[in-house]
């Protein structure tokens, strides 16, 4: 802790201060006794009883060993000191960071809606209107207090009741029974009256807590009323029995029956009333459930900020373009077509993985889709790991002093054309000392401060940043005992909390860095010099105490943090405008910066928050109570579909923008067509703005969903023919784009190379999303040619596999492929010789490739050109065929030994 204070100063102590405040307040509420006359203490009583028992082990008189708790009293000074001691001793168990934060905020004169809390006690007894304005007026103002103040207070008060009503009186009753039994005069009626009071107060407390439930309906008032009546009845019986216990020692059998029957009758009355209501509600759902469902809709629309989502009716049409205008139409929409995301992550990873080479000390940790200069890139970030070859005795040295960072932490691939990009062009600073996963997550690193140019770090790197702190003996010895022997008199520079999320959760524990069971995604961004992790600052609360929330969480984006990958410095950027953001800014205003201009073109709205809001919208977009109860217009995200971050131009956009896209289907629908799609903007000032494009249910033209569009592709005869020729084809992401007035899916089809490792683009399919009974699919080697083929089919120009691109058939039979190969040699004026057999003792492969479609022609040409260049002018080129592979080779004499150097081109059958 002392090291944290020295390294982070108030960034570390501020959350501790809030926790301390909350611990003191809540512990005082739960533990401090105020009855200075009685001055009872359970703890001291138990201690003295135990000591007395140990000193009297030889006697059998338990009543003498165990004193009456009712007579036990400590001195006034001891009582006062003990109350303070309890708070200090047990305050840590009651620490609640957000409660302490809120108390400080309130003390500073701010408001969290406490004045609205009394309204909650009337909600179960009032039938609200059938619109959600009631919840907006009554519930929303009190939500901040219900989130941060009420739950810890209820917990502290409940603990107090448990200790000083429950445990206190149970101990008092048990000790009284032991003493009375020893004297032969047990007062059973007195004991029963005490237990009745304890149980009655417990039941009343349970009834009180029911006001703070997350669901209220037409039966809630009966449940609360019945619970409170039972509690009051038990307390009344307790008073009655207390008075009668002065005369009687035992409870009469009649009195037992009266108490049991009373509770049973109350339960029956409440149960019958609730059952009758349920029976009536089965036939009158709108009248009974409608008002409460309306409030549920209102509260959850507030929780999900659904009123901020713009809704548009999407008019799906299928318009053919005149063949004469197709070329011009493509040129008009070139801004969209040029930005189509052709490469998905699986294909990108297959191309990037070989780039890591044989390096044994790094591994892929995460991937992100990023944008730079209005282009999309797949970026793979890496983490340092310990090579498996490191022996056990060298493990400590290598973990802490050698493998301290990733030398070149990013690999990048352009998401449209699939070309691997030199990451240093995007990230000038690629050394990752603070990042994600691997050794950064599990260990610290360090070096002696007097190393004077000599370094043990990887690649002879010598860290010169501001991250970490210097620790001198004996602190360094306590931190790591090995330093006592290795560097007994030297200061050590230690770098801790190198994992980004761990670092953030240590200094800013208010935020969620693990959401829905997954670690929050952080993005690498750069200002052109330094590289940062962009960490979303998402605040989240449990809504169990908010009426009509039905348990859906309260989530808000308060802003972002920029964490320097080299120095570990943290800068905060504000984005939210909710009550917590106001609280946070009041305490951390000096740590907040304006959003840098360079970040505006790299920032991204958190996918986790976008998905959650969309899930909330799937249900609570329905504001009509009748439709909500019928539950026939709820949406769902298609199975297996994730958010696509793309450059697109949805309807109403003047130019392509970087957006997140989620397609939605009608829940329970068998047609698997889209009910619409949700987009979220990532450009400032509209960062986080969501828009939903709804397809009317009664629309004559349907919008195909991901499942349906895959079926459309499989049914296309052109694709069926091409699929048989491709090597191990894999269908990539099917992403919906709006190109001009056409909703179109662009689906890449990948094929493995001859080695079966590196992904190659076999073809691109453009599938019309608008459906009136016939599918339209275009294939091409680029997104433009695929879209052109789609428009040609739509206009009736091309209906079969005659679709061409650049004059070459997209789907080529074996003869066409062989002719294309031979034409390459003919263009080079190379003559081919076909021997009857090949019998050369030594043969060497120059390369191999699969050639099935026009998409493979370019790479095939490159291989043949390379082969001709190595053979040289005048060499005789041999050709022979084995199965479905054509081989070309030439003879070369090395050290008087004839060698065959050849290439293999697989052309199929």
Regions flagged by a language model, labelled:
Residues 2-805, 824, 862-865, 869, ...:
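Soluble extracytoplasmic regions of secretory-pathway and membrane proteins
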Residues 491-494, 667, 810-816, 851, ...:
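Short, surface-exposed ligand-recognition loops at beta-strand->loop->(often short) alpha-helix junctions
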Residues 510-519, 827-839, 875-876:
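Short, well-structured beta-strand/strand-turn elements
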Residues 806-815, 843-846:
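DNA strand-break repair and replication-stress modules
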Residues 814-831, 861-863, 868:
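Amphipathic alpha-helical segments
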Residues 821, 838-840, 893:
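A compositionally biased, intrinsically disordered/low-complexity signal enriched
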Residues 833-883, 887:
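BRCT (BRCA1 C-terminal) domain core and associated BRCT-interaction motifs
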